[in-house]
């Protein structure tokens, strides 16, 4: 079982429950072969201001973004139990969900899954990598009872 530390650094109130987050992450782990020694994850729900600061500092991109992933970088010789950290801009997730005619819960599930896959080394820079990552997200979300997040 993974230990998830959830931090609330936003006034946004319609956040997913810890039990839902645990279910989403545990389901993702069923589809992936990963380091069995890793068992911790931090998710920080943030506002647009903090998201903008982090996005500009770490990705050199202006404005807020929905999710940022920070894989754990252990000190050599000291094994780490953490997969890393996710920073999720809750107000932006809600706005995107509304614009895409999705429930906020479905969009949070998608972005937590998406961010967690980044922590596991998946990316979407190249087209075939993006296709692999999206297909995995679709399978995980389907297992959780959510629709394909990429269909209009």
Curated annotation (Swiss-Prot):
Keyword set includes Isomerase: no
PROSITE patterns to which the protein is assigned, alphabetical: UPF0054 (PS01306)
InterPro entries: MetalPrtase_cat_dom_sf_prd, YbeY, YbeY_CS
GO annotation, biological process: rRNA processing
EC numbers on record: 3.1.-.-
Binding residue positions for Zn(2+): 114, 118, 124
Subcellular localization: Cytoplasm
One Pfam family it belongs to: YbeY
Essential cofactor(s): Zn(2+)
Domain of life, per lineage: Bacteria
Gene3D superfamilies from the UniProt entry: Metalloproteases ('zincins'), catalytic domain
Gene Ontology MF terms: metalloendopeptidase activity; RNA endonuclease activity; zinc ion binding
Family, as annotated: Belongs to the endoribonuclease YbeY family.
Biological role stated in the UniProt entry: Single strand-specific metallo-endoribonuclease involved in late-stage 70S ribosome quality control and in maturation of the 3' terminus of the 16S rRNA.
Name this protein carries in UniProt: Endoribonuclease YbeY
Organism: Coxiella burnetii (strain RSA 493 / Nine Mile phase I)
Lineage, top ranks: Bacteria, Pseudomonadati, Pseudomonadota, Gammaproteobacteria, Legionellales
Name of the gene this protein is made from: ybeY
């Amino acid at each position: 079982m993974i230990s998830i530390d959830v931090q609330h650094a936003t006034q946004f109130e319609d956040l997913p429950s810890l039990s839902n987050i645990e279910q989403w992450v545990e389901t993702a782990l069923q589809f992936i072969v990963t380091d069995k020694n890793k068992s911790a994850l931090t998710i920080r729900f943030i506002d647009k201001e903090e998201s903008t600061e982090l996005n500009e500092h770490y990705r050199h991109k202006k404005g807020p973004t929905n999710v940022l992933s920070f894989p754990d970088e252990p000190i050599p010789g000291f094994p780490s139990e953490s997969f890393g950290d996710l920073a999720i801009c809750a107000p932006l997730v809600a706005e995107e969900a509304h614009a895409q005619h999705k429930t906020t819960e479905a969009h949070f599930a998608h972005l937590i899954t998406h961010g967690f896959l980044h922590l596991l080394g998946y990316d979407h820079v190249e087209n075939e990598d993006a296709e692999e990552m999206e297909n995995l997200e679709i399978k995980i979300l389907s297992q959780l009872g959510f629709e394909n997040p990429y269909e209009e």
